[in-house]
């Protein structure tokens, strides 16, 4: 069965046992090259063993995230795991609402502390986490079935579509290599700030 519901900020895909929901697709606004507004995407993944959030976006998106969860009869207290693709503020500000979650990130990230576990310790047979550095040295991406949530390895659709490294990066060469790695996966890409790029566009 395939059920797809799309509207302004939410979409949901159920394909057999696949459950992934984009709670918020993200936004990135620049004026004259200066970032004026940045809120990351936030993705819910439900596996047999865990309710997982990948990135929690900014505080002003809290109600959108909670509403998206409620549509599946979930609340923040039902989330077992939060995986942060990196630790920039626009990807982590709602972490505190997930009171029962264990938080995972890369120890290479500036800001990694005792609130986080090393992502390599996370175990779920349905999830693979890979390193995709460039935007930051510790950037990671989360693979689930036919989807990969990439954070700011590809903040916007054109980054992955046209193989353009993100403007904000610590190492442009690493960023490009990460984009190549993501393309080779041949999966639907959930970007950091602009929703989804379907794999058919990446062939």
Swiss-Prot record:
Give me the residues that bind Zn(2+) 1, please: 86, 88, 135, 152
Question: How does the cofactor bind to this protein, according to its record?
Answer: Binds 2 Zn(2+) ions per subunit.
**Source taxon at top rank:** Archaea
> Which keywords annotate this record?
Hydrolase, Metal-binding, Zinc
Q: What one GO molecular function would you report for this record?
A: hydrolase activity
Q: Which SUPFAM superfamilies match?
A: Metallo-hydrolase/oxidoreductase
Q: Which InterPro entries match?
A: Metallo-B-lactamas, NDM-1-like, RibonucZ/Hydroxyglut_hydro
Cofactor names? Zn(2+)
Q: What class of enzyme is it?
A: hydrolase
Q: Which residues bind Zn(2+) 2?
A: 90-91, 152, 193
Which EC numbers characterise this protein's activity in its record? Answer: 3.-.-.-
Q: Which family does it belong to?
A: Belongs to the metallo-beta-lactamase superfamily.
Query: What's this protein's name?
Result: Probable metallo-hydrolase MJ0296
Species of origin: Methanocaldococcus jannaschii (strain ATCC 43067 / DSM 2661 / JAL-1 / JCM 10045 / NBRC 100440)
Its organism's taxonomic lineage begins at: Archaea, Methanobacteriati, Methanobacteriota, Methanomada group, Methanococci
